[in-house]
From Swiss-Prot:
SUPFAM superfamilies cross-referenced by the UniProt entry: Class I glutamine amidotransferase-like
Protein's organism: Pyrobaculum neutrophilum (strain DSM 2338 / JCM 9278 / NBRC 100436 / V24Sta) (Thermoproteus neutrophilus)
Catalyzed chemical reaction(s): aldehydo-D-ribose 5-phosphate + D-glyceraldehyde 3-phosphate + L-glutamine = pyridoxal 5'-phosphate + L-glutamate + phosphate + 3 H2O + H(+); L-glutamine + H2O = L-glutamate + NH4(+)
Gene3D superfamilies xrefs: 3.40.50.880
UniProt KW keywords: Glutamine amidotransferase, Hydrolase, Lyase, Pyridoxal phosphate
Designated gene of the protein: pdxT
EC id: 4.3.3.6, 3.5.1.2
Name of protein: Pyridoxal 5'-phosphate synthase subunit PdxT
Function text: Catalyzes the hydrolysis of glutamine to glutamate and ammonia as part of the biosynthesis of pyridoxal 5'-phosphate. The resulting ammonia molecule is channeled to the active site of PdxS.
Source organism, top-level taxon: Archaea
Family: Belongs to the glutaminase PdxT/SNO family.
Subunit structure: In the presence of PdxS, forms a dodecamer of heterodimers. Only shows activity in the heterodimer.
Amino acid sequence: MKAGVLALQGDVEEHIQAFRKAAQELGRSVEVVQVKRPQDLREIAVLAIPGGESTTIGALARRTGLLDALRDAIKGGLPTLGTCAGAIFLAKEVRDSVVGETKQPILGLMDIAVVRNAFGRQRESFEVDLREEGIGALKAVFIRAPAFTKAWGSARLAAPLKHPELGQIYAAAFQGHMVATAFHPELSTTAVHRYMLNLAKT
């Protein structure tokens, strides 16, 4: 089985290592590849979209022809994890905590609303312990993190947190074969990557 990591920008290597370690823990044979072109999507059984800068990821995906290819593959059932900026890229509604509505290129596939930079900039980074059904307990690392504020359709918000200004917000969202996290699981745990490998068809 092949797992793919979108390799346009962000912490690509950390996701590659997290998939490799998760596969080892599950006793599975998994090759992890970088996804840089539309044709790279053809053979993978699961995908991670890393954090980074969401407007840059969207612009590069459009320029390389990956925007439509990613949308088609994920709509077709490819299990996909979006972390931090990757979660923003998956969402249908995106606004910034400072500038409001954004016009950035997004996949627009998950029925969730996301606020970019909800926890401030780099200096407001933090870690918390979270527990989520199906994934278990994990240490979550938030870096310039977004927040999920609303879900509709078949999407489900998870991992609740109290935000000083936004009130009750959520650090994760699930919708069928798609998972979005406001935090960076690749930096502290293999639990989310194990979950994704278990979603994938062998």
